[in-house]
Amino acid sequence: MWRHFKSLWRAWGMTSRLDKEGIDLFHGLSNELPLTIRKARHTRSVVTIHDLIFLRYPEYYQWIDRKIYAYKFRKACEYADLVIAISECTKRDIISYFHIPEEKIKVVYQGCDVSFTIPATDEKKQEVREKYSLPEHYILNVGSIEERKNVLLAVKSLLRLPEEMHLVILGRRTAYTDRIDEFIHAHHLEERVKILNGVPFADLPAIYQQAKVFVYPSRFEGFGIPIIEAIYSGIPVVAATVSFS
């Protein structure tokens, strides 16, 4: 039965399985624990919290989503034997919003795939350049295309840059993308902005490594893994400083 209601199983149905399997430690990797985790007789628990953006910027989320996230995240922090925050910023937010004791929280920074540290071959670079019709000189942005990511600011910056500089955006299209498209058309930037969706992971290092600079104007991030990917790729990074701490 539970296979038809996976989210309910994670919240309510998993604890009995922990006892049955004799699990010593359960790690909730993405912000939640079973709501009945304390009923597991022999299982200690750890939860990793990535960010609390829905509390810092509630205007970017639906009301019902904010309520669900707040309840699940708070309970996970309260019930866990240890809370892992992926940045000092996230740690401060957990303390501020959920009043979790500081000594219960450990900061463990994130990394990225080692493939970004390996120089792509000339053949691979040429392959992805032809596959995606990449320009010779481009600024790169990677991440979901949503208002919080502030990608429109990067598009606007092209108006102040030389004509030969282009912008390549990699990410999932959302309603916010329509606003970007409108600005592109209004300012005749169609030839200078390329938006790519569904790029295979195997192509990412070669795309990063051919960029002139990586730009990340996001208003808030718990960590910002694309910045690490760009640094590992050996390209300069321009990023907002409001939350990367």
Where would I find each of the regions flagged by the language model?
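Carbohydrate transferase catalytic cores enriched for Leloir-type hexosyltransferases
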Residues: 1-245
